[in-house]
Amino acid sequence: MTHALFSPFTIAGISHHTASVADMESVRFPDEEAFLTRAGDWFKGVILLQTCNRIEIMVHGNADLLGTFLESEGRAGWQMWKDADALSHLLDLAAGLDSMVIGEDQILGQLRKSLSLSESMSVADPLITLCINKAIHAGSEARRISGINRGAVSIGSAAVLLAEEQLGSLAGRHILVLGTGEMGVLVTQALAAKQLSAIYVANRTFDRAQCLAEKVHGTAVPMADLYRYLTMSDVIICCTAAPHPVIKVQEVMEALKGRSWPLDHSRRPLIIVDIAQPRDVEEDVGKIPGVCLYTIDDLRKVNDDTAQFRKEAAEKVREFLDQELVQFIRLFNRKAADELLATLHSWAEQIRIRERDRALSRLSGCDDRVRDVTDDLTRVLTRKLLTDVTLTIRTCAERGEMKIAEDLVGAITRGENICSRTYD
């Protein structure tokens, strides 16, 4: 079976594999809805996936057009996958093979959320919707057959492991979690088993902080009291969705003045792990004496005792995804052919109705029976005339021969451009 696609599909991506936190911040799209609106004018379908360690743009369109669009957006440095390679990359994403923490589950929810946003803005066409749903299904199945997501496998849990490595143990420590979104929930869940003395949860919306704090027997913190609780904390893990830094140099320096406890022989170090994107903590906070600032870039070095198991499980996942790719291409091409055929049949139906009405107008005074027979006759003739064409286009789809199919449609329509190539 060929790996050619019947319609163009492209992914442009930047991730932790090739870029630092700062690099990803420079190309991030702060207003996702505005981006999708602009992209929707260029492509039949578009998905924007932005997480703490990757930005992926998936389009029903070709790589050259996507490259031109990104240049117009002032964004450069993207890695491109096109057609079958793009489908393969999407499967890797959904299965967690491309994640910083191999096998993590969060990517599935992030893909669903991205698709939902595109659907709500009417920029997810049937083909790109098929791609995301198929990838999510394959990713879920890959985890089921391999167990690759066994153990502590999330950016949130990796942040907790990093803090634990720096302090030796989190038992008896005071931890402040800033943010109550999906990542904040994962962080607090990972902390719940660490025998902490106290866990504080801060969020811009205090009710959400209270809700999460209650689940882990912690203390909700109003944002107005953030730096007072910073003074009492050994570790701060930051994971808000704020578009600007929340923890700033001057305020941290002030808070540190009251940080020593009466029985401390020396000033306790403050560990800050910033896993937000864009960053929650001003970069210069890491230069303050007594503060150790870590970002997503540092999570690559975390010693996770389940990593070796997941690496071995990844081999099983790879075999499964290789098989899934063949089916994925078949589904993709079938859906693309359906779209082309729907356009062709719609064009033919318009001609049928026009010619039927013209014939009936020449049969002045005809009764309903004549009208019904004429309608049936034109309908049957149209269907029969398109039968062989339909079969040929489906065969072209199986082979990924889009150009042959479009040339055939062009011959039938005498060059009338019923299949807009704007997105090719």
UniProtKB/Swiss-Prot annotation:
Keywords: NADP, Oxidoreductase, Porphyrin biosynthesis. One of its GO terms (biological process) is protoporphyrinogen IX biosynthetic process from glutamate. The active site is at residue 52. The record marks 89 as: Important for activity. Its EC number is 1.2.1.70. Substrate binds at residues 51-54, 99, 104-106, 110. NADP(+) binds at residues 179-184. One of its GO terms (molecular function) is glutamyl-tRNA reductase activity. Possesses an unusual extended V-shaped dimeric structure with each monomer consisting of three distinct domains arranged along a curved 'spinal' alpha-helix. The N-terminal catalytic domain specifically recognizes the glutamate moiety of the substrate. The second domain is the NADPH-binding domain, and the third C-terminal domain is responsible for dimerization. Homodimer. Belongs to the glutamyl-tRNA reductase family. This is Glutamyl-tRNA reductase. It comes from Methanospirillum hungatei JF-1 (strain ATCC 27890 / DSM 864 / NBRC 100397 / JF-1). The gene is hemA.
